[in-house]
């Protein structure tokens, strides 16, 4: 599994923990992480995430994380993670202050959450959201 990390906004160097983010995404992808596939983790600012959210999801506001699954381009690769995870650094800073935790942990939480979506988890119902939050927390404690 190839996991690429891109910083498309100014993220201070002490928060650019690429290996940590890759470990979180890999752990969230679980059994898929050892297979073929490629995931891009892209850190963006509030303006960019708002634009993506409006253009692709028809939501006119900024958000914390957005994931997109793409069809796997190789024969026999259907169902393998292949996609983009957009994490908003600005929202991570705001929410870290609001929730009283570190910015890095907030960024990692969003990266793991996005990867869980690529692995097939959903958070459309309260029960699903709770399961996803539990799994996110378990993964963060593990890495």
From Swiss-Prot:
Its cofactor is Zn(2+). Keywords: Cytoplasm, Endonuclease, Hydrolase, Metal-binding, Nuclease, Ribosome biogenesis, rRNA processing, Zinc. It comes from Elusimicrobium minutum (strain Pei191). InterPro entries: MetalPrtase_cat_dom_sf_prd, YbeY, YbeY_CS. Zn(2+) binds at residues 113, 117, 123. One of its GO terms (cellular component) is cytoplasm. Binds 1 zinc ion. It is an enzyme of class 3 (hydrolase). Its EC number is 3.1.-.-. Belongs to the endoribonuclease YbeY family. GO terms for molecular function: metalloendopeptidase activity; RNA endonuclease activity; zinc ion binding. It is found in: Cytoplasm. Disulfide bonds: none annotated. Pfam families: YbeY. The lineage of its organism: Bacteria, Pseudomonadati, Elusimicrobiota, Elusimicrobia, Elusimicrobiales. This is Endoribonuclease YbeY. GO terms for biological process: rRNA processing. Single strand-specific metallo-endoribonuclease involved in late-stage 70S ribosome quality control and in maturation of the 3' terminus of the 16S rRNA. It comes from the Bacteria.
